[in-house]
């Protein structure tokens, strides 16, 4: 058994921050890539269904009685009597079926659906989803799903061992749902177009409004866009404009984007994402790792032959401690490359980098928002 004790020591924090920092390189994007139309949002659909054809990996009727009830109801709807019969076959599983209904979807088009086990099924691999209606938040049925479930994980089981890779109790049915009802849309009758930024930012919203007004002034003779806040830009429809063509022209306009500096840390997976606008004031960091390994090797002591002694177990414990690292690295530079190079010079793993970044933020030397997930 290994116990890891990691400590972080900030040796010194230089008080002077970097003054004249050069602006970050500009990133340009199309409006369609950074904003979405408010009237064109997705809608969520949900349904309850059955997956059949499983090879003994479905729900047990004792642990999941709702699966048996659903199967009996389905067979009765098909005109098959289920009186007096009881099945112990585990080839059926109850699942929740979810999907996203895209905007402006028309009847007859197909969408992907996700199936997730509700009972004690161990795998949905090889199963087929039978006809399942998908409803929206208003209770109306908008699509019907059916098809073979695709499961990426697998499971192999024997009498004494089980091997599982990935998730076997959830999967997808590509193109498994047919849209039967379209959402009521008033896009053509709209007076205003509302663009919503995927990453809210006042600077980007103002730039979008300026770019759209420049296009509208040249095309229609006046400005039409106004930045409402950091997330929404409202565009008034010109009288002579066709709304579909207007949106097609606007979404292809190029705008310079800007986002706040962030460092995103996922402590569970050790993932660290550092934005290009992150700035670090000069700071010196030392990081060390203390590893303590405890090994138990019990010894079995046998009694002498023909004696009345008993076999005994004598514990034996070996403890070894090792300390690595401890070097001091000075991070002195305004850009992301300097920060990454300084952390790599210390030679630490991702969990150590997480601790260092938290320490730098606490010292006031990290000029960015630290987001912990």
Swiss-Prot record:
Residues in the signal sequence: 1-26
HAMAP family hit by this protein: FlgI
Subunit structure: The basal body constitutes a major portion of the flagellar organelle and consists of four rings (L,P,S, and M) mounted on a central rod.
Gene name of the encoded protein: flgI
PANTHER family per the UniProt record, alphabetical: FLAGELLAR P-RING PERIPLASMIC PROTEIN FLGI, FLAGELLAR P-RING PROTEIN
Organism: Rhizobium leguminosarum bv. trifolii (strain WSM2304)
Role according to the record: Assembles around the rod to form the L-ring and probably protects the motor/basal body from shearing forces during rotation.
Superkingdom: Bacteria
InterPro entries listed in its UniProt record: Flag_FlgI
Pfam families: FlgI
An annotated GO cellular component: outer membrane-bounded periplasmic space
GO molecular function term, any single one: structural molecule activity
Subcellular localization, as worded in the UniProt entry: Periplasm; Bacterial flagellum basal body
NCBIfam families tied to this protein: PRK05303.1
Protein name per Swiss-Prot or TrEMBL: Flagellar P-ring protein
A biological process term (GO) from this entry: bacterial-type flagellum-dependent cell motility
